[in-house]
């Protein structure tokens, strides 16, 4: 796997995780 691809996957995963935490926090989970 290319290092650039790995970086994008990591960044996208971190972004998705952050959104999920905010949504769950608002719903009181």
Curated annotation (Swiss-Prot):
Regions that span the bilayer: 3-23
Keywords tagged on the record: Electron transport, Membrane, Photosynthesis, Thylakoid, Transmembrane, Transmembrane helix, Transport
GO biological process, one term: cytochrome complex assembly
Keyword match Thylakoid: yes
Major place of residence: membrane
Keyword Thylakoid listed: yes
InterPro entries reported in the protein's UniProt record: Cytochr_b6-f_cplx_su8_sf, Cytochrome_b6-f_cplx_su8
Any one GO cellular component localisation term in the record: plasma membrane-derived thylakoid membrane
A GO molecular function held by the record: electron transporter, transferring electrons within cytochrome b6/f complex of photosystem II activity
Signal peptide: none
Location(s) in or outside the cell: Cellular thylakoid membrane
Coiled coil: none
Lipid bilayer topology: Single-pass membrane protein
Function: Component of the cytochrome b6-f complex, which mediates electron transfer between photosystem II (PSII) and photosystem I (PSI), cyclic electron flow around PSI, and state transitions.
Family according to the record: Belongs to the PetN family.
NCBIfam families recorded: PRK14747.1
Self-association and partners: The 4 large subunits of the cytochrome b6-f complex are cytochrome b6, subunit IV (17 kDa polypeptide, PetD), cytochrome f and the Rieske protein, while the 4 small subunits are PetG, PetL, PetM and PetN. The complex functions as a dimer.
The protein's name: Cytochrome b6-f complex subunit 8
